[in-house]
């Protein structure tokens, strides 16, 4: 993809929302993953658990232009040091969590794929589980609604596809509850 884009003079951006989960899974450094792209975005609020915050990285010229655009569009934020401190804390203290999230997703995925109305599942490589239900199962939206009534949140990812994301706020107990409630909902 990078080669093709660059052959047409295009700038290549990496949405690095899950970059650190990939790093935890493979041991490949973030620098290596981003080596061939022009820009990368890393979100601190997803797997790292910061309240908000992200970093956009690229060439010095690109960053100057991005900064100007941010200011022109009203993106200035006052007293952001407190949020920056939370991001630094997350980097210093939650990196190991990425492996825990990945392992938990794999464990949950292994159990979900065995449920009778589950048709298939994408490979669970990091902390994201995407699976489809068979045509005669409730729709994804119906499953989401039924689980929400049971205080379990899951995302519809299409008419028959569902998405689960593990993160700092999802522990093994929550994973077990998800599988138990999903089993109940798919049995009705």
Show where each model-derived region lies.
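Conserved PLP-enzyme active-site core in the AAT-like
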Residues: 1-122, 126-150, 155-170, 174, ...
